[in-house]
Amino acid sequence: MFLLHALDQTIKKLKAQTANILTLMNLSLGGFAIIAVMHGQLNLSLLLIFLAALADRFDGMVARKFNIESELGKQLDSMCDIISFGVAPALLLYQGILIEFGAPGTIFTVFYIGCGAFRLARFNISENNGYFTGVPITVAGCIATLSYLAIPYFHPVFFLSLMIILSLLMVSPIKMKKV
C-alpha cells in the first residue's frame, strides 16, 4: 500500500513538472545549438534551434492542458528563450554571414540579443490581455534562423538589415494578437 501511494505521489510530482521539463529541453537544445556554432556546425545549429522551437511550443500547451501554469514556469521559459531564440540564432547568423562586417556585424548581433532580452523582460511584467507587445522573440529567432538558409541567395547587407529590423520589431510598441 505504501509503495502504491509513493508511486502515485511521484507520478503527480512528475506530471506537475512536465512543462518545466519541456522548457529545460528548449534550453538544452539552444545551448547545444550555440556549441554547434562554436564548432562550425551551422546546419546542425539550425536544426537544434528549430527543435528548441518545438519544445517551446509544447511547454505552454502542456502547462495549460494539465493546469500547471506558474510564475516560475513563466520566468524559466523566458530565460530559456533568450538562449534558444536570442543568443543561438544571433550567433548562427554572425558565424554564417555577419562576421564579414567586422565591428558592425558584432554590434548588431549583440543589439539583437539585447533587444530580445528587453522584449522578454517586458513580457514578464506585462498583463496577459490576449496581445503581445512587439514581435515575440520566438518568432524573431525562427525568422533569423530560417534566413540562414538564404545566405547563398542574398547580398550580405540583407542579413545585417534583417537583424536590425527584427531587433527593432521585438522592442516596438506594435500590438499583435496571440494565436
Which residues does each PLM region occupy?
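C-terminal membrane-associated helical module and adjoining short loops/tails
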Residues: 1-7, 11, 132-179
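Topogenic membrane-insertion module of multi-pass membrane proteins
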Residues: 1-57, 172-179
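C-terminal ends of transmembrane helices
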Residues: 8-9, 59-70, 115-129, 168-179
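Multi-pass membrane catalytic core of lipid/isoprenoid biosynthesis enzymes
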Residues: 14-24, 65-121
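Active-site His/Glu-centered metal-binding helix of metallohydrolases
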Residues: 28, 54-62, 79, 83
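Helix-coil boundary and interhelical linker segments in multi-pass alpha-helical membrane proteins
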Residues: 32-48, 83, 87-110, 146-160
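N-terminal TM1-TM2 helical hairpin plus the immediately adjacent luminal interfacial "cap"
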Residues: 35-41, 57-74
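Alpha-helical transmembrane segments of multi-pass membrane proteins
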Residues: 49-56, 111-119, 148, 163-173
